[in-house]
Every structure is written in C-alpha cells, then in structure tokens.
C-alpha cells in the first residue's frame, strides 16, 4: 500500500506477491452492493463486477486465481482468463455459476422499467380477476350437485327441496350466500332424524 495522497478515497490497490505487474483497484460503487475491480496488466484494461462482493479483496491461495472476493461458499474469483491467453483459467477451480462476469458501466446502471412492470402487473391481475369471476359464476350456475361445504351430500337435500316451494328454495340459497356460517349441531340432528324417519316409513311394509 502506498500513501493516501496517491490513492483516491475508497480505492484499494493490491499487489500479489507472485507477480508485481498485476495491479488491482477495488471501488465501492455508490448506492449499490457491487464492487468494481479494475485490472491493469500490460496496457490491458478489464472490469470485473461481482454482485455478491461483500468483503474486501483477498489474495487467493490458488496459483490460477489472482484474488477472491469473500470467503464464503459462493466465492467469485478473478482468474487469468482476463489475459485472454488462458481462457480455461477462469473455469479451473470454480463452478459454472460462480464465474465472474466482465460487464460495462452501461450494464451496471439500473434500467427504468418501473412503468413496464406496473403495466404487466395490472394486466396479470386483470386476467386473474376475470378467470376467478368466470369460475365462481360457472360453479354457482351449475346447481346443487356434488358435495357441500360441510362434507354432506347435496343430493340428500334435493329430495327435500323437491317438495318445497320455489320461493323457499330461493330464500335458502340467498341466506346461504349471505351468511357463510355452517349449520349448527341442532340443525344437523333435526335433518338426520327427518331423513331417517322418512326412510324407515318407506321401507316398512303395511
């Protein structure tokens, strides 16, 4: 490390012990978690952007890797692939997903796609609302077939609804739509006793 006058604020220059020609500068880009690493060697300039760079740059013990960012599982390393003479050096010792990318500053800048996202969200919400409305209306218009909320067979109640008048039938449907509370135990017992008595009276030979 040299004096603070030569290096600007927020810049850290690292020189590995193996090769003094390689100079690295690591800068913290404001209002982001991205560390920008500038690599200069023989008038070649590369910029490495590591999105998960949360620690300062450290010299990697491996010979193929110049330095690594962080000491965690998802380690991003800058290797000799920046020389373009050994392109396989980047892949050595790293997994496919953990290879550092070479990006420009234009790619770093956040895109103003907030309006597009809002439009997409509204269109998706509208589609979901339409589909939910269609499903609800179709299930209501199908009638009273199948099983009800409390698990009892609706076909049992159809026999009772046939003898009742249309007005009472409509009032029952409206009351069930308005009041979503399930039936009480007393109502259930009454209905069960009515069905049992009706079945027994039909089966008894006279």
Curated annotation (Swiss-Prot):
GO CC terms? host cell cytoplasm
Q: Name one Pfam family in it.
A: Pns11_12
Q: Say if the entry is tagged with keyword Disulfide bond.
A: no
What molecular functions are annotated in GO for this chain?
RNA binding
Q: Does the keyword Transmembrane helix apply?
A: no
Bias class Basic and acidic residues marks the residues at 109-132
InterPro entries on file: Pns11/12
Keywords in alphabetical order, please.
Host cytoplasm, RNA-binding
- Enumerate the residue ranges of region (Disordered): 87-206
Q: Where in the cell is it found?
A: Host cytoplasm
Q: Which cysteines are joined by disulfide bonds?
A: none
- Role this protein plays: Constituent of viral factories. Binds to ssRNA and dsRNA.
Q: Which family does it belong to?
A: Belongs to the phytoreovirus RNA-binding protein family.
Q: What is this protein called?
A: RNA-binding protein
Q: Which organism is it from?
A: Rice gall dwarf virus (RGDV)
The lineage is: Viruses, Riboviria, Orthornavirae, Duplornaviricota, Resentoviricetes
């Amino acid at each position: 490390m040299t004096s603070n006058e030569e290096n600007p604020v927020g810049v850290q220059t690292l020189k590995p012990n193996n090769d003094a020609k390689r100079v690295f500068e690591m800068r913290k880009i404001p209002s982001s978690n991205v560390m920008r690493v500038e690599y200069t060697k023989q008038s070649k300039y590369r910029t490495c952007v590591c999105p998960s760079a949360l620690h300062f740059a450290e010299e990697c013990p491996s010979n193929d890797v110049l330095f690594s960012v962080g000491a965690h599982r998802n380690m991003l390393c800058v290797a000799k692939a920046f020389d373009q003479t050994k392109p396989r050096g980047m892949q050595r010792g790293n997994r496919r997903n953990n290879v550092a990318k070479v990006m420009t500053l234009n790619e770093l800048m956040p895109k103003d796609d907030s309006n597009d996202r809002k439009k997409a969200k509204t269109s998706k919400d509208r589609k979901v609302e339409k589909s939910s409305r269609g499903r609800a209306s179709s299930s209501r218009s199908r009638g009273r077939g199948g099983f009800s909320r409390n698990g009892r067979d609706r076909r049992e109640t159809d026999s009772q609804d046939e003898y009742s008048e249309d007005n009472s039938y409509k009032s029952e449907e409206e009351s069930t739509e308005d009041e979503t509370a399930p039936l009480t135990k007393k109502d259930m017992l009454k209905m069960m006793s009515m069905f049992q008595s009706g079945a027994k009276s039909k089966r008894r030979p006279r």
